Curated annotation (Swiss-Prot):
GO terms for cellular component: plasma membrane. Disulfide bonds: none annotated. The keyword Membrane applies. The gene is rarD. It is a multi-pass membrane protein. This is Protein RarD. Residues 1-11, 61-72, 123-128, 168-179, 235-238, 291-294 are cytoplasmic. It is found in: Cell inner membrane. It comes from Salmonella typhi. It comes from the Bacteria.
Amino acid sequence: MDAKQTRQGVLLALAAYFIWGIAPAYFKLIYYVPADEILTHRVIWSFFFMVALLSVSRQWRQVKRLLKTPKKIFLLALSAVLVGGNWLLFIWAVNNHHMLEASLGYFINPLVNILLGMIFLGERFRRMQWLAVILAVCGVLVQLWTFGSLPIIALGLAFSFAFYGLVRKKIAVEAQTGMLVETLWLLPVAAIYLFSIADSATSHMGQNALSLNLLLMAAGVVTTIPLLCFTGAATRLRLSTLGFFQYIGPTLMFLLAVTFYGEVPGADKMVTFAFIWVALAIFVMDAIYTQRKK
């Protein structure tokens, strides 16, 4: 890879993880809209944005090829349920003052990825990776044993996104095409819920202020733009390099929660964060050491 491609890849990766990191600020703007309604808008408008993007980039041939493989289509239904659940839990957490725990979930996620890789893909742990995973587990167990609480939201986000990544890895479908099919699977449920079941003060778009409707439609942009940046970065950078950017998102979430939204991490959360941060430091050092050996 030449230097120009690498620079472009770095900028795209920074853009993707920066947008993901500050996404909670967008959801805070529409905190008064129920989380399930925000999810339906995210699904509906993401679908239409993906249709537009695939049309502009002329990638419908890939969609046609995918439609000829029923097994992949049905596996994308599973990944759609996983990512939909992840989106719903994240939106609910942010708008119910659990942004810190959401950030913890995405700090834990890389370690869960390692664990699932070992269990389902036959990948072997290096010693330092074992240590990192054990420390992360200890952080959760100490919180449970000492404080009688469990970071359910964090674990839910970490495991749902990790299983989503595992399923997508197994399917091996291009990101944009896969997301179109995922949102297509979720579209009927989202549309039926929004137009037939939801009955809140914001569920009828014809009665909403234009500014609110534009914010709700922006859910599609918040979803698709960072994905496009990420896929662009993935084609220009080595995966080992791209992996180091994944901590930008949860770090920004943590800073937003503490600095702007008044969330104060209690002793139980700080104990768990401390274990996770040490585990991630070991994980990153091991990755750097392994990369240099190659």
